[in-house]
């Protein structure tokens, strides 16, 4: 940034796409399965080749990677809307669901707590001021932290609601250096 400029933390995700939320009952699981199946031969050829390119066009529902992560139902329905929208595009890899709940869950293992600014992704205030402080800290198991439990329960919710018919990724894996 140039001298005097301020980071615009209130700007939304430039990759976010406006989508219409879709309930599990209204989502076309058959169409998605057919789309995903139609890509497998190309993926197999890519994996067996010495070189090549696969095109991945992620349709990210606006808000899911911000404040919409707090409401599992809303996040899932927005992501289902994004999956449905993604079927309109030629790609080599099908889109998937992501039970995203911020990138601060590793910080949560060290006692960090999420802070939600209006309309923004969850944040964690800096906790360590040196590498020595970080190395001396004793982390908690992720399943024993509020953010960790939220992610695990949200993943289970996504799997239950879709009956395991859609791919669900791990949440966004981050480094403890983010603390």
Task: Tell what function each PLM region has.
Residues 1-179:
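Catalytic cores of TIM-barrel enzymes
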């Amino acid at each position: 940034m140039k001298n005097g400029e301020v980071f615009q933390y209130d700007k939304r995700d430039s990759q976010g796409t406006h989508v219409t939320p879709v309930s599990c009952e209204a989502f076309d699981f058959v169409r998605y399965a057919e789309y995903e199946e139609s890509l497998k031969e190309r993926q197999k050829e890519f994996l067996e080749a010495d070189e090549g390119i696969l095109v991945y066009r992620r349709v990210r529902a606006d808000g899911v990677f911000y404040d919409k992560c707090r409401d599992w139902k809303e996040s899932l329905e927005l992501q289902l809307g994004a999956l449905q929208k993604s079927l309109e595009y030629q790609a080599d890899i099908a889109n998937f669901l992501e039970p995203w709940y911020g990138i601060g869950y590793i910080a949560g293992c060290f006692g960090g707590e999420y802070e939600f600014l209006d309309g923004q992704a969850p944040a964690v205030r800096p906790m360590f001021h040196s590498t020595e402080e970080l190395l001396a800290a004793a982390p908690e198991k992720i399943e024993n932290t509020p953010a960790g439990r939220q992610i695990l329960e949200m993943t289970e919710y996504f799997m239950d609601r879709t009956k395991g018919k859609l791919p669900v990724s791990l949440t966004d894996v981050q480094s403890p250096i983010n603390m």
